[in-house]
C-alpha cells in the first residue's frame, strides 16, 4: 500500500463532502491494533457512492455484491455501502483521526467492536472468522479504559437486532455469549451484556 495514495484519496473524499469512515486494518491501527493490510476498507453512505465513483473513475477493478473495488497504483480500496442502519451509524458517528497529516474519519471503538463481532458471525472461512474474533478481543483488551458497558450493550443489541430468522438469532446469541466469556477472561465481567428480563 502506498501511504501517499491513501492520503490523497481520503483528502479528495473530504474535500468533496463524502461521508465515510475507515474500517478494517487501518481503522484497527488507529485503535491500537497494528495490522499489515493489503487494502483500505471504507464504509460510505449510499447517497455518496456516485461521488466516490466519479472521484475514482478509471480505477475501478470490479464491483461485488458487497463492495466497489478500486486500485490506484499498488493500493486497493474496497468501498462498502453503508446500506444498513448499523453501518450508517458507524459512518455518522465516526471519529476524527490523523493520517499522514490529513484529518480522516475512522469508525469509533463501539462501532468497530460491533462490525468485527458481526463479521465474525458471518464469515464462512475459519481463519477469517478467527481473525475477526482476535480483533474484537484486541479492541477491548488494548482499550480497557475506553470500552464501557454501554459500548458492549450497543454492540450486542445491534447484533441481535440483525436476526431475521430463529437460526440467525441462535447464531448471534452464540456470538454474544462468546463475547461475555471473553469479558470474563479479561476480568471485565462488569461490562458483560445482560439484557433486561
Task: State what each model feature region is.
Residues 1-197:
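Compositionally biased terminal segments of proteins
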Amino acid at each position: 500500500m502506498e501511504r501517499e495514495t491513501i492520503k490523497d484519496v481520503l483528502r479528495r473524499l473530504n474535500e468533496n463532502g463524502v461521508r465515510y469512515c475507515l474500517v478494517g486494518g487501518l481503522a484497527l491501527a488507529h485503535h491500537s491494533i497494528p495490522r499489515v493490510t493489503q487494502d483500505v476498507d471504507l464504509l460510505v453512505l449510499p447517497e455518496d457512492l456516485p461521488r466516490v465513483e466519479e472521484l475514482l473513475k478509471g480505477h475501478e477493478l470490479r464491483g461485488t455484491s458487497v463492495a466497489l473495488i478500486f486500485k490506484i497504483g499498488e493500493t486497493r480500496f474496497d468501498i462498502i455501502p453503508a446500506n444498513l442502519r448499523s453501518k450508517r451509524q458507524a459512518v455518522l458517528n465516526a471519529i476524527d483521526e490523523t493520517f499522514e497529516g490529513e484529518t480522516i474519519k475512522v469508525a469509533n471503538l463501539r462501532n468497530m467492536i460491533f462490525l468485527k463481532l458481526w463479521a465474525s458471525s458471518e464469515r464462512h472461512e475459519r481463519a477469517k472468522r478467527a481473525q475477526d474474533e482476535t480483533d474484537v478481543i484486541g479492541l477491548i483488551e488494548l482499550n480497557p479504559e475506553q470500552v464501557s458497558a454501554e459500548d458492549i450493550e450497543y454492540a450486542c443489541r445491534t447484533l441481535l437486532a440483525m436476526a431475521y430468522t430463529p437460526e440467525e438469532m441462535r447464531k448471534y446469541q452464540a456470538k454474544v455469549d462468546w463475547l461475555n466469556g471473553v469479558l470474563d477472561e479479561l476480568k471485565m465481567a462488569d461490562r458483560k451484556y445482560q439484557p433486561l428480563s
